Amino acid sequence: YSLNFVEPWLGGRQPVQFSFSISQTKQFRYDYFTRKADKSQFFEIRGLTIGMARRLSIPDDYFQLSQAIAYQYYKLNNYYTGLFTFGDGESHNLSYNISLLRNNTYTNPIFPTGGSSFTISARLSPPYSLITGDDFSDVEERSEYTNYKGEPIQSEIDQAKYRWLEFYKLKFNGSWYT
């Protein structure tokens, strides 16, 4: 399920858009012998996003700046599909999203006959390893992630690495209509 709320004009003379979104999804493994979903094996995602956007008057009136804080929680329970490097555990994703948009398409917003639209955006997570001082380059040699033979336990290593997701994404998109 998901629940979304958007307030396009949050008071004042200048329009400030406020948005809120909450979602949850749960996927179960399929048991080919019983031809039913196996409820003991699942992958669950819960998410929450709060954002604000406003029009800018500099350099012209076609610019818009939007920002959002997003959190996602991933839980895997006996979900060994090869899609992830671990099948049991959880992961957290906290990110800050910012985008700058210039949109001056005209005539029809679905099928524009003129104008242009350009977007540059970034999605950033906090640098957890820098904050906590964790260095995962030598995690395979650490005693807490090895078995009694001294061999690395890959599922525990991956769970430690991906407990808090750390990344950045930069995107640019442009369209020109004539």
Each PLM stretch: what is its role?
Residues 95-178:
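Extended beta-strand-rich architecture
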Residues 1-111, 117:
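Gram-negative/organellar outer-membrane beta-barrel architecture
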